[in-house]
């Protein structure tokens, strides 16, 4: 019996080391050989599953699908607005500091320390998934989450359901691919550029609602630049489960307030806010903060009545 236990331990350790080695290898490949190294990995990946490639993908942090507006002959009156994803892209300077801090606190507290992959997060996810045998855990850095979102957008634009499936599936292969690309991204873009990209690409509610500018308008009738602490924490809390935590749905509001307060707790723990700011914010009923703009949630075509025709 002791011998069998020892063997199991060695196997678990070997699996753990293999997993971490692959993560680190991605970093070494990217930092030393960069594109040639990634291409060599990519050729192996594509031979197994073609849609799991890591090359030839545009990750421009500003090139995201936005709304298109149809104007009347006067060039000013908006007749209709068309979109696949309800999003308005804004630069980081037009996103409040509270919103930036809330997002980092919620999604990746070591964002400004790692190089694209949060090794501690990966180790925690490994233990939960492979040793404790729980569901596949996250462990993804904010950069990796940005990569995942862009891969899904790219697949939809290309009308490629296979690539879209692989971009979202809960597998180690997908995680490793995201790690490789995330490390590449952090060589090309600054942390602030990546944070800007994520704040514009992430889903912040049901009804195809993406990006903090649209979320600010939808929930509070304001702009991303003017979001206060409570509003920012509310929006940051949504990304974990956009349908369940969407505060515009009345039955979601108790859970939405709970999730908002979790974000506020994290912001306090990470020294983004003071104890007084935290205490004042967590006692604020979420319903009293909302100013829902229902027209912002229209999906696919936001039209000006009969004028659209």
Annotate the PLM regions.
Residues 48-49, 156-167, 295-309:
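Charged, glycine/proline-rich intrinsically disordered loops and linkers
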Residues 275-309:
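Non-catalytic structural connector segments
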Residues 1-69, 77-78:
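N-terminal type II signal-anchor transmembrane helix
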Residues 64-274:
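Peptidoglycan glycan-strand catalytic modules in the bacterial/periplasmic cell-wall system
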């Amino acid at each position: 019996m002791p011998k069998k236990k020892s063997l199991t331990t060695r196997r678990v350790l070997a699996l753990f080391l293999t997993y971490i080695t692959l993560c680190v290898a991605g970093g070494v490949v990217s930092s030393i050989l960069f594109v040639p190294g990634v291409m060599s990995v990519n050729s192996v990946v594509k031979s197994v599953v073609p849609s799991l490639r890591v090359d030839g993908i545009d990750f421009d942090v500003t090139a995201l699908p936005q709304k298109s507006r149809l104007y009347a002959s006067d060039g000013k009156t908006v007749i209709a607005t068309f979109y696949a994803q309800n999003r308005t892209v804004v630069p980081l300077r037009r996103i409040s500091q509270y919103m930036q801090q809330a997002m980092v606190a919620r999604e990746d507290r070591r964002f400004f320390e790692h190089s694209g992959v949060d090794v501690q997060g990966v180790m925690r996810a490994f233990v939960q998934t492979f040793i404790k045998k729980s569901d596949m855990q996250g462990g993804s850095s904010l950069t990796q989450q940005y990569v995942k979102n862009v891969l899904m957008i790219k697949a939809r634009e290309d009308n490629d359901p296979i690539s879209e499936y692989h971009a979202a599936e809960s597998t180690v292969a997908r995680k490793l691919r995201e790690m490789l690309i995330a490390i590449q991204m952090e060589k090309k873009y600054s942390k602030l550029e990546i944070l800007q990209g994520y704040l514009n690409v992430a889903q912040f509610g049901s009804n195809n609602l993406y990006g903090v500018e649209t979320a600010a308008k939808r929930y509070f009738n304001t702009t991303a630049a003017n979001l206060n602490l409570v509003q920012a924490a509310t929006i940051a809390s949504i990304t974990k489960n956009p349908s369940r935590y969407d505060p515009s749905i009345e039955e979601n509001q108790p859970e939405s307030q709970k999730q908002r307060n979790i974000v506020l707790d994290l912001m306090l723990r990470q020294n983004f806010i003071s104890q007084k700011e935290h205490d004042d914010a967590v006692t604020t009923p979420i319903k009293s903060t909302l100013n829902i703009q229902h027209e912002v949630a229209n999906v696919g075509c936001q039209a000006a009545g009969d004028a659209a025709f």
